[in-house]
């Protein structure tokens, strides 16, 4: 079982007298910066010129280029997209790191897969809230918190663990609990969850269910409601109280169908396929493929995205959602 740390375990905040540079001001960046500031930390924001720069200024932060922010900071938290981090790190952060500094991440991908190679004289750790930035900020403002993970990759100063817990405490995570892990475990489980269940697995299951009904002659609108729209109702019940809560809340007919039909859809062969996905994450096959795809300009990424967006379930869904003004996406969908 994971070891969990709480507020009572952070007896001395070793970062309170340090300057923290938040690199990036998106979903996580704005939450980390504001929570740390509210907890008395000295925070600056490092960005390239653009909308995020203006937003951070409006929110009252001193904003600098990434290089300028890194140069003056004791702690550098990189909250940029995975694929952008190596280039920004090499060009703007690495030349400005000093011995004893802390290099911090919210995901271990680039360190674990050797895309970012920190010098031996800095501490390297991650603090990863298990929720989106807006939730990290809102719960903090309400006196609560989102749980987080932390891991130490490199302890150059002898107090990297204390620094990691101090940072987690600064964003409020110790109110809920901070689980200790490793860069390897955080990275591999995160990627597996995305690919086999949360994104890849769910979208494949939803499309397969939709196509099965439509191919059998049922109206696509009904197939959409049954296989995609109502998924939120079930996921919310699971989110609130696990599988037990979901099964308690649905009809007995639905629960019995769960018991007798679920294992026929997700079979032992499915688990073997999941094992193959995990193996490709563990041996670096997935990471190498994604890095190569990004460096090539993402031709397959964009082509697949365009094709998927025109699947019948998407065409039908767009029309049906016009009937439901209460269903609004948090962000406008489009090509990244």
From Swiss-Prot:
Keywords: Amino-acid biosynthesis, Branched-chain amino acid biosynthesis, Magnesium, Metal-binding, NADP, Oxidoreductase. Its EC number is 1.1.1.86. Residues 182-327 form the KARI C-terminal knotted domain. Binds 2 magnesium ions per subunit. The active site is at residue 107. Transmembrane segments: none annotated. NADP(+) binds at residues 25-28, 48, 52, 82-85, 133. It holds the Pfam family KARI_N. Gene3D superfamilies: 6.10.240.10, NAD(P)-binding Rossmann-like Domain (3.40.50.720). Residues 2-181 form the KARI N-terminal Rossmann domain. Belongs to the ketol-acid reductoisomerase family. This is Ketol-acid reductoisomerase (NADP(+)) 1. It comes from Bacillus cereus (strain ZK / E33L). The lineage of its organism: Bacteria, Bacillati, Bacillota, Bacilli, Bacillales.
